[in-house]
């Protein structure tokens, strides 16, 4: 049987697995679904069409599924979808999507999301990310797998941060951050590549060498973006062990909509 504190208000239409725990004074709306093993702390509000997966830990005072902070929103049935095994710390706010842009805000699996983080409408946070305290994502931001965002960082609408990239403390991010890169500051500057993070993920020496070379091509040799992209494409045959990493970078550069941080 679901463990619901007697002071919590759970709408009878909400769908909670029998193993879900709900803390004191939490409010859960009628269109909410919560999977097995998830624990919800005290004083949380979970509303809207919000789906939460298995084994998440949601700490006190979090607000999930509130209407988007977008003046165009007019009550349409948009969604928030959260995956499995996420840690969502105190005072986090995740908003529903808006129509015309997919209408769904998503958070994947195994993310570590610290206190006061804001995830706005239509953001897509993939898997294994770390978002430190007071991270603020504006609408339509995409964070790929294994991204790390330092505390007090703001990310502009429609920005993409590529896989394995790290953004340092108190940064202002207004352009796309390529995979593997290490950036920080306001204005934002590329400081190198995320060698410590990649080593922690067991990147081999050849893969690290390829990432280092991609960084050099983009940022250290005075090349235009087109010249750098040509050099990066050639690495797929020169460094076959890193072909997947090269392809990831090529795809990111080809699909960037805000221009890359340089």
From Swiss-Prot:
InterPro entries, A to Z: Acetyltransf_C, Acetyltransf_C_sf, Hexapep, Hexapep_transf_CS, Lipid_A_LpxA, Trimer_LpxA-like_sf
Superkingdom classification of source: Bacteria
Biological process annotations from GO: lipid A biosynthetic process
Catalytic activity: a (3R)-hydroxyacyl-[ACP] + UDP-N-acetyl-alpha-D-glucosamine = a UDP-3-O-[(3R)-3-hydroxyacyl]-N-acetyl-alpha-D-glucosamine + holo-[ACP]
Pfam families (alphabetical): Acetyltransf_11, Hexapep
A GO-annotated cellular component: membrane
SUPFAM superfamilies noted in UniProt: Trimeric LpxA-like enzymes
Known pathway: Glycolipid biosynthesis; lipid IV(A) biosynthesis; lipid IV(A) from (3R)-3-hydroxytetradecanoyl-[acyl-carrier-protein] and UDP-N-acetyl-alpha-D-glucosamine: step 1/6
UniProt-annotated location(s): Cytoplasm
Family of the protein in this entry: Belongs to the transferase hexapeptide repeat family. LpxA subfamily.
PANTHER family in the cross-refs: ACYL-[ACYL-CARRIER-PROTEIN]--UDP-N-ACETYLGLUCOSAMINE O-ACYLTRANSFERASE (PTHR43480), ACYL-[ACYL-CARRIER-PROTEIN]--UDP-N-ACETYLGLUCOSAMINE O-ACYLTRANSFERASE, MITOCHONDRIAL-RELATED (PTHR43480:SF1)
Protein name from the UniProt record: Acyl-[acyl-carrier-protein]--UDP-N-acetylglucosamine O-acyltransferase
Originating species: Variovorax paradoxus (strain S110)
Source species taxonomy: Bacteria, Pseudomonadati, Pseudomonadota, Betaproteobacteria, Burkholderiales
Gene expressing this chain: lpxA
């Amino acid at each position: 049987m679901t463990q619901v504190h007697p002071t919590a208000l759970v709408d009878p239409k909400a769908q909670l697995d029998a193993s879900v725990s709900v803390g004191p004074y939490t409010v859960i709306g009628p269109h909410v679904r919560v999977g097995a093993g998830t624990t919800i702390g005290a004083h949380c509000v979970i509303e809207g069409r919000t789906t939460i997966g298995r084994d998440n830990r949601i700490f006190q005072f979090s607000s999930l599924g509130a209407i988007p902070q977008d003046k165009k929103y007019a009550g349409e049935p948009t969604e928030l979808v959260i995956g499995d095994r996420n840690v969502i710390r105190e005072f986090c706010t995740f908003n529903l999507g808006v129509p015309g842009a997919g209408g769904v805000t998503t958070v994947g699996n195994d993310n570590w999301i610290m206190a006061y983080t804001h995830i706005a409408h239509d953001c897509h946070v993939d898997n294994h990310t770390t978002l430190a305290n007071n991270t603020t994502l504006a609408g339509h931001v995409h964070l790929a797998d294994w991204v790390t965002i330092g505390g007090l960082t703001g990310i502009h609408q429609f920005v993409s941060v590529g896989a394995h990239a790290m953004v340092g403390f108190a940064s202002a991010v207004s352009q796309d951050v390529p995979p593997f890169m290490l950036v920080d500051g306001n204005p934002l500057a590329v400081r190198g590549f995320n060698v410590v993070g990649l080593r922690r993920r067991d990147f081999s020496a050849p893969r690290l060498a390829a990432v280092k070379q991609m960084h050099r091509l983009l940022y250290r040799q005075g090349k235009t973006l087109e010249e750098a992209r040509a050099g990066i494409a050639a690495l797929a045959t020169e460094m076959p062990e890193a072909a997947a990493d090269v392809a990831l970078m090529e795809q990111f550069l080809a699909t960037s909509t805000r221009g890359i941080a340089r």
